[in-house]
A protein has these predicted regions:
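Catalytic-core segments of enzymes that bind and process phosphorylated/nucleotide-bearing substrates
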Residues: 47-51, 55-65, 109-162
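Small/polar glycine-rich anion-binding or flexible loop at a beta-alpha turn
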Residues: 23, 84, 164-174, 196
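Short acidic alpha-helix initiation/capping motifs at coil-to-helix transition points
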Residues: 140-146, 168-175
Length: 212
């Protein structure tokens, strides 16, 4: 819940969530986004969609799929590509390296065009792997913002626009400890997460973006 609400502050559409206290611990209730009044919406994982398109799993390939089959009305396909770039930067900076293609979902519209669904499974993995679960950029899956922005054009962004998107995400992520505690994460858990999210590899990337 804390990670998703932080992502929302970074300009990422997220599923509506609610923490549910249990006898031991807390569960997270997530409102389904593949439902509408009286109907079930057709949803595809990026894993299925990219395989059907003959593409390797990766953020640039997903952006290209949105360019080809995204919702045209109101330039939605462009907005989805821009948001995908923000999601990638957020995953990197929050140390969510379990961002594989089955955790990205596309909603199939009546005209068979595709819309990026709200994010629904976003949290720090705490593994300090240094690489993402999908292809990121010209350096493969390396968890660096520079790597993510190396393919800015795939998201319909200029180098300057992509940097601005990344800087906004970095400003939000920089306040993650205060936000997490405000959302009910214990001080002890926050301190443990800080060992990964605030380790030099990621902290220096945030600082570099904020100074840009």
């Amino acid at each position: 819940h804390a990670s998703l609400t932080l992502a929302a502050l970074a300009g990422i559409r997220v599923a509506t969530t609610r923490p549910v206290p249990l006898a031991r611990g807390t569960a997270l209730a997530i409102e389904r986004f593949d439902r509408a009044p009286g109907q079930r919406l057709h949803a595809l994982s990026a894993h299925v969609a990219l395989r059907a398109a003959g593409s390797e799993p990766g953020y640039p390939a997903l952006a290209q799929l949105l360019r080809r089959r995204g919702v045209l009305a109101h330039g939605q396909w462009q907005q989805d590509k821009h948001e995908l770039c923000r999601r990638l930067v957020f995953h990197i900076l929050i140390d969510n390296t379990d961002d594989h293609e089955k955790k990205h979902v596309l909603l199939v519209q009546d005209n068979q065009q595709l819309r990026l669904s709200p994010a629904f499974d976003v949290l720090p993995t705490g593994q300090a792997l240094g690489y993402q679960s999908m292809h990121v950029g010209k350096e493969g899956a390396v968890s660096s913002v520079d790597n993510a922005l190396s393919m800015a054009a795939m998201y319909g962004l200029s180098a300057r626009e992509a940097l601005d998107e990344a800087r906004h995400v970095a400003r939000v992520v920089d306040g993650w400890p205060v936000h997490f505690i405000a959302q009910g994460v214990s001080a002890e858990a926050t301190a443990l997460l800080a060992d990964q999210i605030d380790r030099p590899f990621l902290r220096e990337q945030r600082r570099s973006l904020l100074a840009a």
